[in-house]
Amino acid sequence: AVGPFAIEKGMIDAKEIKTNIVIRSVNTGSIIEATIQTPNKKVKYSGDYKIAGVPGEGSPILLKFKNLVGGVTGKLLPTDHPTTIINGIEVTCLDVSMPMVMANAKDFGIVGNETSNDLNENKTLLKKIEEIRLSAALKMGMGDVSGKVIPKFALLSKPLNGGTITSRYFTPKTCHETHAATGSNCIASACLISSTVASKITNIEATGNDKITIEHPLGLIDCLVETSTTVNSFDKNFIKS
C-alpha cells in the first residue's frame, strides 16, 4: 500500500510501465524495494494476481527485501547458536527481517496444520508459547518484552501441500490467519541455515538462489532468498534480498 499511496499523493513520480520505490521499515531498519505496475505512468490496480488469504485479485507488487539481518538485535543468531533449549524445548532464535523464535510444532503436542481458530482456542498452548517467547527474548538481548509484539513466534512442521515447510505464525499472542511477509523472510532464511529447527525439518542446502514456499492456514507464500556461500558460517551479510 505504501508504494501506490506515495505515487497517488505525488511523493514519487511514476515511471512508464513500472516504478521502483525504496521503502525503509522504521521497525526493523530493513530496506524494501517495491516494484509497482504503472502503465502510462498511472498506478494499475486491476489484475489477476492472487494472494492466499486475501480476497479478490489485483495487480502484483514485487517486494525485494534488503539489509534484513540483525535489524533489531544486531545479530543473525541473537543467541549465537542455531538452536537453544528453553523450558525444555529446542528453539531457533533468528533476526532476519523480523526477530523470531521458532520451534517444532510436535514439541508443543500439535501436528502443525491446525487452523488459526483452533490454535487460538488452545489457551494452554498460547501460555506455553508466551512463556518461551519471554525467556527467549532475554537470551536474545531484547530484555523484557511482555508488553511488546516482538520477537514473533512460529511453530513449524513438515509441508502437506507441496510447499517447503508449514508454519503457524503468532503475532505474538494469537495465531495469524495467514502469514506475515517479514516472518516469511525469517523462516525462509532459517530453512537455509544449518542445524536450525527449520532446516532440520526441510533438510535442504542453500544454492545461492532458493525458492522457499511456506504453507500457512489459508494457502502458500513464496520467498526467493539470495545467499552467499558463507551461509553455514552465519555471515552477517549472507542474505542479500
Where are these regions (language model features)?
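Active-site proximal loop and beta-alpha junction motif in alpha/beta enzyme cores
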Residues: 1-241
